């Protein structure tokens, strides 16, 4: 039945044998490969480029998702105290999302203390200690199926040590500097050339990208930290009005005890970036 269905759908396709597929069961892929001379291509990039310019309705949905995320983050900020686990704190955002009609989370990125360096460790039952940094990335698919993707770094007790203040300030400077650069028609290559330079002792721990698109999840574009000849990514595109992008920063010294993760979500307007979230970037 599965093979017959694929054959029926494939018959009207033109002589062009390039077929881009977003999602397909293995039976369908096998049938296409075994019965037709199609060159199967991953459709993800094409679809994400097609939806990179957001409509007014999409912006409304995204703002609703961000409002829900901010409500949950504010409750997390109020609740954070030594003795609770990372998962207890993280559950507050999940509960808020579901209570307000939200959907799901792409990741489990909330970490405390030494788990904040390097980044990308998973939220766990680790007990948060006095004076520790707590960093998180929402990656939250909220109401109406749109993504709220912002990051904040708090500190238990709300008083940063000198070292914590240093890395938090660098991450803050990184986001603000790069956000100021972006305007319609700026090429990804030019952005990468002009972007804020990470401290040398933090480079090996850098976040995978400086900028990424966002819509119903993380999307195109994806602007990496370039290598010397710009061969490690696609820098050929340009920023366009009504794109929505996230500006990322992670500051964690190689071998350091803690790291700071900050990120904000912006709408590209004719005059530059318009911050979609109202939560202060320097909230600790």
Locate the predicted segments by residue.
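Active-site cofactor/co-catalyst pockets and adjacent glycine-rich loops in catalytic enzymes
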Residues: 90, 94, 98-138, 145, ...
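Single conserved hydrophobic/aromatic residue that forms the stacking wall/gate
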Residues: 1-9
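Solvent-exposed, amphipathic alpha-helical segments
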Residues: 68-79, 170-184
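Glycine- and charge-enriched low-complexity intrinsically disordered segments
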Residues: 170-179, 274-284
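Flexible, acidic/His-enriched mid-domain "rim/lid" segments that flank
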Residues: 10-105, 159
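Short, contiguous acidic/charged loop-to-helix segments that flank catalytic cores in large enzymes
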Residues: 1, 162, 233-234
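Short, acidic (Asp/Glu-rich) active-site segment that either coordinates a divalent metal cofactor
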Residues: 40-44, 51, 55, 59, ...
């Amino acid at each position: 039945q599965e093979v017959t269905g694929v054959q029926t759908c494939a018959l009207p396709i033109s002589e062009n044998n390039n077929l881009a597929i977003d999602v397909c069961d293995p039976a369908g892929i096998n049938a296409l490969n075994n019965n037709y001379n199609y060159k199967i291509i991953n459709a993800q990039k094409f679809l994400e480029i097609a939806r990179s310019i957001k409509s007014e309705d999409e912006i409304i949905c995204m703002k609703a998702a961000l409002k829900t995320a901010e409500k949950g983050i504010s409750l997390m900020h109020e609740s954070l105290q030594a003795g609770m686990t990372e998962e207890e704190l993280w559950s507050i955002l999940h509960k808020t999302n579901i209570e307000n009609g939200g959907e799901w989370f792409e990741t489990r990125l909330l970490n405390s203390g030494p788990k904040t360096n390097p980044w990308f460790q998973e939220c766990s039952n680790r007990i948060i200690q006095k004076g520790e940094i707590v960093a998180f990335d929402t990656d939250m698919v909220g109401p109406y199926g749109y993504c709220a993707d912002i990051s904040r770094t708090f500190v238990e007790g709300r008083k940063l040590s000198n070292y914590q203040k240093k890395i938090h300030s660098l991450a803050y400077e990184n986001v603000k500097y790069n956000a100021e650069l972006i305007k319609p028609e700026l090429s990804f290559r030019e952005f990468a050339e002009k972007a804020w330079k990470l401290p040398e002792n933090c480079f090996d721990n850098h976040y995978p990208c400086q900028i990424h698109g966002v819509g119903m999840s993380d999307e195109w574009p994806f602007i990496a930290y370039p290598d010397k000849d710009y061969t490690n990514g696609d820098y050929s595109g340009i920023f366009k009005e009504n794109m929505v992008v996230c500006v990322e920063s992670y500051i964690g010294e190689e071998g350091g005890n803690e790291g700071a993760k900050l990120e904000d979500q912006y709408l590209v307007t004719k005059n530059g970036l318009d911050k979609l979230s109202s939560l202060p970037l320097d909230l600790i």
